[in-house]
Amino acid sequence: MNNRVHIFDTTLRDGEQSPGVSLNLNEKLQIARQLARLGVDIIEAGFPITSPGDFAAVQAVAREVRGVTVAGLARANFKDIDVAWDAIKEAEQARIHTFIATSDIHLKYKLRKDREQVIEAAVAAVKHARKYTSDVEFSAEDASRSDIDYLCRIFQEVIKAGATVINVPDTVGYTTPGEYAQFIRDILEKTPGMEKIVLSVHCHDDLGLAVANSLAAVGAGARQVEGAINGIGERAGNAALEEVVMGLYTRKDYYGLMTGINTPEIYRTSRLVSSLTGMPVQPNKSVVGKNAFAHESGIHQDGVLKERTTYEIMNPEQVGITANNLVLGKHSGRHAFRDRLEELGYHLNEEELNLAFSRFKVLADKKKEITDHDLQAMVEDEIKHIPDTYVLKYLHISTGTAVVPTATLGLQMGDELKEEAACGDGPVDAIYKTVDKITGISCTLVNYAINAITGGKDALGDVTVKIRCEEKEKVYIGRGVSTDILEASAKAYVNAINKLIHDMQ
């Protein structure tokens, strides 16, 4: 059996279904380009028929991202499939991913169809998709709760109809590793034609078993794993692809399998997805968490200092985590700055480099010791890929225990400097009310989070906000970075407002 496992990334489709996550087209393109650098085999760019915005994003990914298969999701009906093809047809390699539920509970309550009707719909959908492309994936939604004999029968029929990938999702995260492995073995054994196709798995994390189930499945013969970066997704999320990949990489002695993933790009991909979705990575998360390679216990520290492999089964460099050392200072030049950014995986054009270097010089005057983490946060904050309708020019705060907090600030809009002041319930609230007065946009703050990038009194503060506007149902995510927490808070809110305005235009 082939020992190559294909990695199917659904961060832009299933991952974006996480509550409170809403990515614009440019953000989806950023993630897609990084996924291509990471080396995933397939990017599921979205569900084109759901909205014009989703269609445009899938189409943009298909047009602009090369070296990877781009998939569009479609229900098992002709209209969905036609729209999916229109969105992905300019891809270097295009895949239509069509699905229908197969469990009795879904047939009875959701589809209101009998088993024969579902088989007919699945076969017709695959045949229709094959008119457009030779790469067609069929998914049996809620497969893990479906009758095995019926599942094998529908798989046999869609293989005859032309499906090249068969996906067996654990849609509600119900199964367990041993059970799922046997399920996969039974499907491979009982279904004629399986030797012609790639068997795929798509696991959800409702019981915290998505990665374990995915690894059990590839051990049983599956050769494609679907999941999302950082494990994001609706409800409890999807299998975290970085964990699946490093599980196979670290335990190749056990699995004997390989992927095409460029593992040093894992950490940067995780950071990018976290930054753009506004979903922080928990510190103790496997592979990419802040504490994944930290050792607190004296016994552990002593062991690692003597020999890393005493307590580290992976080393940080394998996933792209660099040592947090002093790298640059205020006397560092543009060439050294560019070289260090490229070592960290950032390849900026001239305009982006000029912006980032100007920001670096300002930071270097405020902060004596600049680390890799500082540089990463600064560059990710500076390079936003949307036009700034408003730019924060200055900020003044009056606050104290016996003073009503007041913010005065100026926002540059083209050639005009707009200035206002407002009081609030705390300095951050005062800032946001002032921004609302200037922009004329009334927003609800859904979430506010702050994180210190590094230690010390001059640490960079990284603020993420989520806002919802009365005129739009979407949530907009903004990010701001500064050694001054209030300035970072203001920049994050203005960034979110700029995204909202860009979306409305």
From Swiss-Prot:
Pathway: Amino-acid biosynthesis; L-leucine biosynthesis; L-leucine from 3-methyl-2-oxobutanoate: step 1/4
Residues the entry annotates as binding Mn(2+): D14, H202, H204, N238
Subcellular location(s) of the protein: Cytoplasm
Keywords of this entry: Amino-acid biosynthesis, Branched-chain amino acid biosynthesis, Cytoplasm, Leucine biosynthesis, Manganese, Metal-binding, Transferase
Keyword Metal-binding: yes
Cofactor dependency: Mn(2+)
Gene: leuA
MF terms in GO: 2-isopropylmalate synthase activity; acetyl-CoA C-acetyltransferase activity; manganese ion binding
Stretch list, region Regulatory domain: 391-505
Protein name: 2-isopropylmalate synthase
Its job: Catalyzes the condensation of the acetyl group of acetyl-CoA with 3-methyl-2-oxobutanoate (2-ketoisovalerate) to form 3-carboxy-3-hydroxy-4-methylpentanoate (2-isopropylmalate).
GO cellular component: cytoplasm
Enzyme class: transferase
Ranges where the Pyruvate carboxyltransferase domain occurs: 5-267
